[in-house]
A protein has these predicted regions:
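Conserved beta-loop-beta/alpha segment of the NTase-like Rossmann-fold superfamily
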Residues: 48, 54-139, 143
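Well-ordered alpha-helical segments embedded in enzymatic catalytic cores
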Residues: 20-23, 79-82, 183
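Small/polar loops that bind or transfer phosphate-bearing groups
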Residues: 16, 38-40, 65, 128, ...
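Catalytic-core segments of class I nucleotidyltransferases/pyrophosphorylases
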Residues: 88, 95-96, 103, 108-119, ...
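A structural signal for short hydrophobic beta-strand segments in well-ordered beta-sheet cores
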Residues: 12, 140-142, 195
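N-terminal glycine-rich phosphate-binding loop and ensuing alpha1 helix
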Residues: 1-47, 109
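Phosphate- and divalent-cation-binding pockets in alpha/beta enzyme and binding domains
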Residues: 46-49, 82, 171, 213
Length: 215
């Protein structure tokens, strides 16, 4: 995304006049979510300056600042582990995770999905989309029982939005740099990684060209 991200973190890049992350914040507020934790690293001081405390959306924003506290980005699983006390203060409640650099304008973070997830013993629930041209191999298959599969005739791409239980990250020491995929594979191997299709619009805003295509 350079040179755009030389001066602006990806989630604050604008699509149709609005920062990418604001689409998520508006949808989370509409879904009744009250507290949102934003993991930051690159140019992290720009996030509180741009978004404030969240009051304008009826949210309480909390910032988990990885650059300040650990000298750099902890990747997704490491970032979640650092933020667990804010994400799930009781240590058990599930929480949403969504990447700040994906465009999901119609995703409404359904409360019914949270209730269904809480009633099961799964550690994670992923939303999957058709494979984009830049990622034709996909990430996961989907079983008839709604579980993610490592191998399948048809694979789909994880849309970078999901529900998770704190237990999946409880063994990750704070400050560890760790990608999410090993933890997803761990839940999958235990038969505790759910998945479902998402048919709405979705874009991984990973290049200048893809960003321009959304304008």
């Amino acid at each position: 995304m350079r040179p755009l991200t030389d001066a602006c973190p990806k989630p604050l890049l604008t699509v149709r006049g609005k920062p990418l992350i604001v689409y998520h914040l508006e949808a989370l507020a509409a879904a009744g979510v009250q507290d949102v934790v934003i993991n930051t690293a690159w140019l992290e001081e720009q996030f509180p300056a741009a978004l404030g405390d969240g009051q304008r959306w009826g949210l309480r924003l909390h910032y988990s600042m990885e650059q300040r506290d650990h000298g750099g980005a902890l990747e997704t699983a490491g970032g979640i582990a650092k933020a667990l006390p804010q994400l799930a203060p009781d240590g058990v409640s599930p929480f949403w995770v969504v990447s700040g650099d994906v465009f999901l304008p119609g995703f409404d973070f359904p409360a019914a999905a949270v209730a269904a997830f809480a009633a099961r013993a799964r550690l994670g629930q992923l939303w999957l989309v058709p494979n984009a041209p830049h990622h034709p191999q996909g990430d996961f298959g989907l079983s008839d029982e709604g579980l993610a599969l490592r191998e399948a005739p048809e694979k789909l791409t994880w849309a970078s939005v999901g529900l998770f239980r704190p237990a999946l990250f409880a063994d990750v020491p704070v400050g560890t740099r760790l990608a999410l995929r090993p933890k997803l594979d761990e839940a999958l191997a235990a038969g505790r990684l759910g998945a479902q299709r998402w048919a709405g619009a979705w874009t991984d805003v990973g290049t200048v060209e893809r960003l321009a295509g959304l304008q």
